[in-house]
Structures are given as structure tokens and as C-alpha cells.
């Protein structure tokens, strides 16, 4: 099997799959290079103990169209040479779409992990990537019953499996370790990250968010994403003027989990952190108008705030009513995926 990866969330998902697949199936990977910051890429491979990708492409810093086209060309050449039994893609990035389209054009079976998600906002590039990938995939692994429902409404009913969320495997694996961490800071804090274009690619919008974070009743530890950092420089925003915001560099995966664990609440526009906050029993405020992770909105565990940014403080003060330990599975998603793929492959041979 060839797995196509290129973004931070995909490295996390692939680490879980590799752990589950050891001794059972052969996996090679293509790294498209979509994420290029050291903490967003190379350190992840060391920290997550992911095998070094057999192939590396250079797709950073391009527009959506040129980036996807560049990936398509590179992935197709590799697939023609490797002739894998199937190609596996994760999530909803340009890497996901490029991997799926490349395999589809070559009639190689496609496996989509995290299938069926819908935000119902087609202005999001990720939403288009999800839909197109699902409609080319042969085997679709869903994180929740809602994913299966969404696929069914679009006429996709065959090859669909409910397995839970593969990111939960790694979160539970890490937090199960019996180790007491030193306290990260000598103050209580909210943990914040931002990277979506609609939040960070406009100076006025970005300043509005910083202004509100600066008024919150506890300090905000702000892990600055590479995209956000570039824009802060471009817009000549002096972050030192926001005394309530403590800026740190983007964090490696486990450090990010540590920051969530010690925080009072999480403020983000990240998809993955909405789930990680839930699993780590932290209130999450999502600075978006919609989310594909609709289940987290239940019981006030996650709340969407987009237009009325001043609502963030009030939303944080609303304590979640309940956390469901079974949301998105029980931490064995990787094993379910591997076993299903092996069983289906053996059936096809017979």
C-alpha cells in the first residue's frame, strides 16, 4: 500500500496506522511537502516514529491549483513505478485530493480515512477536497455515524465502514503513559491557535481577534502557525503590544497535547484540535462559522464563534455539561482499518 501524506494532521493519522500495521502489511509513503515548517513536518516524523517517506515531493508555497497540479504529476509518476495494490489518503487537504485523483486515473483502488465529513460550506477548499475524494474512493472509513449518513445521502453506500477516529488512537496512547510532566507555565491560561485564511489573511480580522484575546480574564498562550506568523510580519502587527497574549512558536504534536491538557480552555480554528480538546476534557471555542466535527458541539463542549468575537469570554464561561468517552471510537481505529483492508484484499484474491 502507498499512503500519501503531507500535512501535520496526516502525519498524526499515519503514525497511528503504521503502529497498527506493523508485521501485518507493507506500507510505503509519499510526502508531498505541503507542510514545510520544521515543527509541522520533519520533527513529527522523529517524534511520532513514522518511517521516513520513500518519496518526497516539493509542493510548498504554491496556490491551491498549482500545488495540486504539482502533486498530481509527482504522485502519478511514483504510482506508475510502484504499482501498489491500493492508495490510502487521509482527511481533506490538497494532498488528499491529489492522491485520490492520481490513483483514480490509474485505476488503483483508493482508501479514504476520515470519509463522509461535511461542513456544508463549499467556500472551504477542504470541503471540495472531501467531496471529490469520497466520490473517487473504493473503501471509505468513517469516524462517526454522521459520516455514514452523509455518504448515504450522496448515494455512496458500498465499501463504507464505521471505525472511529484514527487521531484518537494516538491521543489515548500518549495520555495513558504514566509520567508526570513539569508544569509548562506558572500561570493559568487559555491555549489558542489560528491558521485559516479567513481568520489570518486579513489584517483587520486578525487584529480583531488579537484585540479580543487581549481582553480575556486569563492569559492566552498563542502558538503561532507559520502562515499566521508570515501575515503578522506582512501586516506589521506588533504582538508585544498585546500584554495578555503570550506568543510561542508552533508546537510539536505531543507538546501541543501538553498545552491543551494544562489549559483552562482552547480557542482555535483547527479541525483536529476541536477533537483533541474534547478527548482531553477541555472546553473549546472554534473561531469558525461551521464545523465538520458537529458531534463536538453537543453538550456545550465546543462552540462556534465567528462574527461576534466578543462572545468568546461568555462562551468559555459556559461549562460543558458532559463529555462522552466513546465519541469517535475507543482508540483502536488503526487496527480496524488494517484488519478490514487485509480481509477485503484476501477476499478479492479468492
Regions found by a protein language model. Give the residues of each.
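Conserved C-terminal portion of the radical SAM core fold
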Residues: 225
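Nucleotide-activated sugar donor-binding and catalytic core shared by glycosyltransferases
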Residues: 1-219, 228-350
Amino acid at each position: 500500500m502507498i499512503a500519501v501524506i503531507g500535512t501535520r494532521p496526516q502525519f498524526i493519522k499515519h503514525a497511528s496506522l503504521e503502529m497498527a500495521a506493523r508485521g501485518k502489511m507493507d506500507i510505503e509513503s509519499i510526502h508531498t511537502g505541503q507542510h514545510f515548517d520544521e515543527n509541522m513536518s520533519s520533527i513529527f516524523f522523529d517524534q511520532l516514529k513514522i518511517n521516513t517517506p520513500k518519496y518526497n515531493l516539493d509542493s510548498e508555497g504554491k496556490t491551491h491549483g498549482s500545488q495540486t497540479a504539482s502533486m498530481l504529476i509527482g504522485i502519478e509518476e511514483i504510482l506508475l513505478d510502484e504499482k501498489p495494490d491500493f492508495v490510502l489518503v487521509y482527511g481533506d487537504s490538497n494532498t488528499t485530493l491529489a492522491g485520490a485523483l492520481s490513483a483514480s486515473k490509474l485505476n488503483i483502488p483508493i482508501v479514504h480515512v476520515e470519509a463522509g465529513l461535511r461542513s456544508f460550506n463549499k467556500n472551504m477548499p477542504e470541503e471540495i477536497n472531501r467531496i471529490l475524494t469520497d466520490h473517487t474512493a473504493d473503501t471509505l472509513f468513517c469516524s462517526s455515524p454522521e459520516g455514514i449518513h452523509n455518504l448515504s445521502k450522496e448515494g455512496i453506500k458500498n465499501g463504507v465502514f464505521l471505525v472511529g477516529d484514527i487521531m484518537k488512537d494516538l491521543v489515548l496512547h500518549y495520555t495513558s503513559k504514566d509520567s508526570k510532566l513539569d508544569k509548562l507555565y506558572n500561570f493559568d491560561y487559555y491555549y489558542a491557535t489560528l491558521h485559516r485564511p479567513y481568520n489570518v489573511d486579513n489584517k483587520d480580522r486578525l487584529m480583531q481577534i488579537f484585540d479580543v484575546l487581549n481582553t480575556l480574564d486569563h492569559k492566552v498562550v498563542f502558538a503561532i502557525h507559520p502562515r499566521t506568523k508570515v501575515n503578522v510580519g506582512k501586516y506589521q502587527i506588533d504582538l508585544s503590544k498585546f500584554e495578555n497574549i503570550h506568543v510561542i512558536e508552533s508546537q510539536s504534536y505531543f507538546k501541543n497535547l501538553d498545552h491543551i491538557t494544562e489549559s483552562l480552555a482552547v480557542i482555535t480554528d483547527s479541525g483536529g484540535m476541536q477533537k483533541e480538546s474534547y478527548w482531553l476534557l477541555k472546553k473549546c471555542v472554534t473561531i469558525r462559522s461551521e464545523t465538520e466535527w458537529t458531534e463536538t458541539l453537543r453538550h456545550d463542549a465546543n462552540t462556534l464563534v465567528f462574527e461576534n468575537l466578543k462572545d468568546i469570554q461568555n462562551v468559555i464561561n459556559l461549562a460543558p455539561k458532559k463529555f462522552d468517552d466513546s465519541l469517535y471510537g475507543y482508540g483502536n481505529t488503526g487496527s480496524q482499518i488494517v484488519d478490514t483492508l487485509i480481509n477485503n484484499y484476501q477476499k478479492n484474491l479468492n
